[in-house]
Amino acid sequence: PEDGFIADTLNKKAFEVEEIIPLDTDTVFDIKVLPNRAHDSLGHHGMAYELCSCFGYTFKKDPRNKILDTIDKHVVKPLVTIDDEKACTRFMSIRIDGVKVGESPEWMKKRLEAIGQRSINNIVDATNYVQFALNKPMHAYDARSVEGSLRARFAKEGEVLMTLDDKNILLDTSTLVIADDKKVLGLAGIKGGKYSGIQTDTTSILLESANFEPTLIRKTAQKYDIRT
């Protein structure tokens, strides 16, 4: 279907299309997603399902997406701890060794830049790409900076976190954080800390994929005035 017809159909059946942005070989739709549909429609796959429903198409899964039956012996699972299962309902992590940090391929750069996301490096870009594709935020830690296990817990009064954009935040006990055995590594579901960020010489990473209580995360973002 043509771009205008797609926008008109979404406006009538699902969401408000605020802007159509033509690119050289693609088109970007700026779509307003209401809070009650954020869980399934803030990612490109979810929006693709919605479009298939609107136009009577069958959604075709990406053949490049594969589920591994076994985990390679070089991929090691780190210990993960959840202190409050209401605040963090699920927390998964895996360690990957032997990575090489560098530029992302051009196709990924273009896709991220098309939606206003600056390319940083192949590791960070991959986590951002998954977030926008699947509506599943992820985060990567430099494994060298993690002492012990990853833990989803509430901050201790007076703890301080320096975020990736060099902002020092004084935390309180209502703030859910990701920490290791000795220090805070990031604001859960919002922003990582600078100390554990991916560096050019990083060779081992910990990938985080977790589900946090959304109201708690929203309040934390408002409290510290952080929008990501």
Residues covered by each model-derived region:
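RNA/tRNA-interacting regions in translation and RNA-turnover enzymes
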Residues: P1-T228
